[in-house]
Amino acid sequence: MEQSASSCMRSPHTGGALWGCVRSPHSGGSGAGIQPYQQAPFALHQKHDFLAYTDFSSSCLVPAPHAYPREDRLYPETHSGYQRTEWQFSPCEPRGRGQEPCQGAAEAVGAEMDSAGGDRLAGAVTGCLEGDYSPQSVPAVDTEKKSSKRKREVTDIQDSSFKADSNCKARKERTAFTKEQLRELEAEFTHHNYLTRLRRYEIAVNLDLTERQVKVWFQNRRMKWKRVKGGQPASPHDLEADELDSAASPSSE
């Protein structure tokens, strides 16, 4: 038995015989009277010729199934608890750097086309395109800009119309004098073209008017009287008196 084992170890070209020597505990046809093969004699007998062929792990021993490539395996591996990993690609976030994340994702999943499937890859690419640089996002930005511009224009138009209405209302607020008030004012104007502050106060109290209303009426009446006189320039005395009257009289609303 020891000679057969040593002969198996010396021959480097005997593949099947060497494998049979190492695997089978019994030799050839004799199975009853021969003791089982043990590894202890190999460890004890350190022969020189045996040391030359000690590296037989790659030829004699059967390699593990995972040592061969996937194509060379005779039987496919079956694992009960193994689940196929689903590739999930998160949609690329919109950034200002362009489509660099999308290109990197497309290159990374290019080798997994057969296993992951074309549908998921198409979904990932579609998600990548839904960023700031996608064709659908550009019209949305333009629409928002146009809507904001229209809102500003409408606001400006409303403000201008409100200002115009307020100006019109301010201009339309005119005092409607009665016939009795006009008669008293005309009588006073024939005697005094310019009123003192005390006299203006008395007229306002008697006619139920404000001092400002009396003052404005006398100013308008003087302008009308000057136009009626034939366009003669007013004397400096009249202009100074008019200015003093306007400055001395407080405006009462």
Swiss-Prot record:
Gene Ontology MF term list: chromatin binding; DNA-binding transcription factor activity; DNA-binding transcription factor activity, RNA polymerase II-specific; RNA polymerase II cis-regulatory region sequence-specific DNA binding; sequence-specific DNA binding
Renumbered residue ranges of the record's region Disordered: 136-158, 226-253
Annotation: DNA-binding region: 170-229
Listed Gene3D superfamilies: Homeodomain-like (1.10.10.60)
InterPro entries from the UniProt entry: HD, HD_metazoa, Homeobox_CS, Homeodomain-like_sf, MOX-1/MOX-2
Keyword field: Activator, Cytoplasm, Developmental protein, DNA-binding, Homeobox, Nucleus, Repressor, Transcription, Transcription regulation
Function: Mesodermal transcription factor that plays a key role in somitogenesis and is specifically required for sclerotome development. Required for maintenance of the sclerotome polarity and formation of the cranio-cervical joints. Binds specifically to the promoter of target genes and regulates their expression. Required for hematopoietic stem cell (HSCs) induction via its role in somitogenesis: specification of HSCs occurs via the deployment of a specific endothelial precursor population, which arises within a sub-compartment of the somite named endotome.
Name of the protein this chain belongs to: Homeobox protein MOX-1
Location in or out of the cell: Nucleus; Cytoplasm
GO cellular component: cytoplasm; nucleus
GO BP field: developmental pigmentation; hematopoietic stem cell differentiation; hemopoiesis; muscle cell development; positive regulation of transcription by RNA polymerase II; regulation of transcription by RNA polymerase II; sclerotome development; skeletal system development
Disruption phenotype: Defects in somite lineages. Secondary trunk myogenesis is reduced, as well as appendicular and hypaxial muscles and their progenitors. These cell types derive from the external cell layer (ECL) and ECL cell numbers are reduced. The endotome is expanded at the expense of a second somitic cell type. The resulting increase in endotome-derived cells that migrate to colonize the dorsal aorta generates a dramatic increase in chemokine-dependent hematopoietic stem cell (HSCs) induction.
